[in-house]
């Protein structure tokens, strides 16, 4: 998958996806192999999007849900022709049709297959559902229910990875389609850290045991996985605060104030031997998001320098611990 394809570049304008390549390639080597089509539960068939990559893992998962002659489909892959072939073969082989198309969010690796789906099944044209829809789609709202034989699917608005992100609870299985908020392996790119953390706690509150992620294998203990995701982000917050406290003890920024640039803070947390490209293009933007969350929480203050009126603050603006 080419860097930036599928909507990821838009998540954080300062993030250059290429900077993650070495890390993501090493992560990919540990991924389990998944079949192109697999019946993963009595009610759920998973179809791979045929778009494996550094951010998509084994590929975008499409889920076909239900047990009868009419079924739901969740997400549509990236628009790879081989994916469309798999969908057609799966439907004809199982002798069932699709009633509704549910999209977790707007990114291209989830919505790119819609044109192929409508070309094959034009009757679905008025049955494409998405939160904050465009003029060709129908809305999904929090709590909305979609029912087919053998499956009751409840929509859960879950912003964080993207503003329009939806998860879906499969009531009969105590399972949740987690979209890109929680992946089968590793952690997702995040549009807004503070919102994402609130959302993950909300996702936990539904009490689902299984997770069907948009990328990666089935999550067998969703509660534990969500807990680990939250703990990892909180650990980064603590490390950032610890570094700022140390700076305050050293007198940087004046009495009781720890003042560090984002560059200095990344070095304090990750060490000073990090590749410059990864530091500038990956770690600094993420640390900036951590600091913005801490500022929202009232834990740190901003001391901007060299900022023009109406301009976006430089990522190297200095941060002040309170």
Curated annotation (Swiss-Prot):
Free-text comment on the cofactor: Binds 2 Zn(2+) ions per subunit.
UniProt GO molecular function: hydrolase activity; metal ion binding
Classification via CDD domains: LACTB2-like_MBL-fold
Descriptive protein name: Atrochrysone carboxyl ACP thioesterase nsrC
SMART domains: Lactamase_B (SM00849)
Binding site for Zn(2+) 2: 109-110
UniProt keyword list: Hydrolase, Metal-binding, Zinc
GO-annotated biological processes: secondary metabolite biosynthetic process
Its biological purpose: Atrochrysone carboxyl ACP thioesterase; part of the gene cluster that mediates the biosynthesis of the tetrahydroxanthone dimer neosartorin, which exhibits antibacterial activity. The two different monomeric units appear to be synthesized by the same set of enzymes, among which the Baeyer-Villiger monooxygenase nsrF is the key enzyme for the divergence of the biosynthetic routes. The pathway begins with the synthesis of atrochrysone thioester by the polyketide synthase nsrB.
Cofactors required: Zn(2+)
Source taxon at top rank: Eukaryota
